[in-house]
Design a protein with these regions (language model features):
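A short glycine-rich, His/Asp/Glu-containing loop-to-beta-strand
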Residues: 1-34
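Conserved hydrophobic/aromatic beta-strand scaffold that supports enzyme active sites
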Residues: 15-19, 37, 59, 67-69
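Glycine- and acidic-residue-biased ligand/ion/polar-headgroup-sensing regions
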Residues: 22, 32-52
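Residue-level marker of beta-strand positions
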Residues: 25, 67-69, 75, 86
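Short, surface-exposed beta-strand-loop junctions and turns on beta-sheet-rich folds
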Residues: 34, 53-55, 93-96
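Short acidic-glycine-tyrosine-enriched beta hairpin
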Residues: 51-73
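Double-stranded beta-helix
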Residues: 60, 77-108
Length: 108
């Protein structure tokens, strides 16, 4: 989808910037241990997620200045719907191997 600028990576917290190109997207994935909060710095995005309590898929457009919180065990995908964009991510730490792909971005 672009690249990641990881500026801090610790056991209890982490921070990175996700940089996207036009119409780039992430895999539909989830984490069992990692919670994430995103702040849209630049560009417009669509976040899609599955609510595992009702099995339904939801989506929300994210514009600059918007914050979105992604809880653990919540499958999600981010798509850039503008020419380019970037999102700041804060999380509750690095947990190796804690990303599980539901659908590859090529099939979304």
């Amino acid at each position: 989808y672009g690249y990641v600028l990881e500026w801090t990576k610790h056991e209890n917290y982490g921070g990175k910037i996700l940089v996207f190109e036009r119409q780039a997207k992430t895999d539909f994935a989830y984490s069992l241990k990692t919670e994430k909060s995103w702040f849209v710095n630049d560009g417009n995005f669509m976040v899609r997620w599955i609510d595992t309590t009702d099995g339904k898929t939801y989506q929300q457009e994210l514009q600059p200045g918007i914050v979105f919180h992604c809880k653990t065990n919540t499958p999600y995908s981010l798509s850039c719907i503008s020419d380019k964009g970037n999102i700041a991510e804060c999380n509750n730490g690095y947990h190796e191997g804690d990303e599980y792909i539901v659908l590859k971005k090529e099939v979304l």
